[in-house]
């Protein structure tokens, strides 16, 4: 489920900052490995340990280099493939991470950590079914982990199994009531169901626990925008962008808010950059359509709205805007048809417009 709201990937916090939850698992696994390793693999082990140091320092390219050296020395080194996958994932190479996790599992089919890590990579590369399969594979070992439950909830969201997602987030918070990611993601789920009060409660609680949780900052921004508080909303999404300057959802959300604040010249380059980074985000295409609508270029606006519709027909108010463009072009029948589809999606603006123009 793509939206302006962001489901934040599961992370944990320690004295060195954020690491993937799997860090705990692979460190435990690696300790066992090295106690048992023979002298013949000492050189590979040293490269592996150097890679771990670089991964902890967030020097991902260096970590990848060391893990690759370890693999050269020991081609069946499942831990090195797994950890190189982590480094690639954090360096925005999702496909490379997926390949490394799969290779680790080819070598060791019982490597539970690699299943857990691959679940995230599959989710981020558009395979939520595969992600769920991997999570189910390790459910017995990790079902009492709050981080596992968050990942499970995220996967169910992508599969539009929202009641299952709710249960997983609830379980995550039962296990650890200050899990910031669980609060952030459950808040996003509430928002998608138009349960705005519990959404805000979860998101504000997440920010109390971690004021620099960028996804929660973004999501609070959109809650404020929903109320029409665009200026206040802008301050929160700008804070999110200070933490994650390249995040395409945040770029798009800032562009959307700038349009609402009648600052289209500032919005246009932001939505363009957002689409360069993620061309499949229906919300960004809607924002670009809104820009063209404001510039009175109906054909360009309609093109973007139709792209958004093809990518995700559940985008809020999409059919209201499609109807407005069709009406502006003199296509009353098509406008009424669009508003009727919006009515089926429970879009208040489309319902109101259809009542005024079509009934």
Where are these regions (language model features)?
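Terminal, low-structured helical/coil segments at or just beyond the last alpha-helical repeat
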Residues: 317-359
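Canonical tetratricopeptide repeat
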Residues: 49, 83, 90, 117, ...
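Structural marker of alpha-solenoid helical repeat scaffolds
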Residues: 73, 107, 141-142, 175, ...
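Bacterial signal peptide processing site
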Residues: 38-40
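Helix-start (N-cap) detector for alpha-helical repeat units in TPR-like alpha-solenoids
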Residues: 43-45, 78-79, 112-113, 145-147, ...
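Alpha-helical segment of the N-proximal tetratricopeptide repeat
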Residues: 42-73, 86, 90, 120, ...
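Structural signature of tandem alpha-helical TPR/SEL1-like repeats
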Residues: 57-66, 91-103, 125-137, 159-171, ...
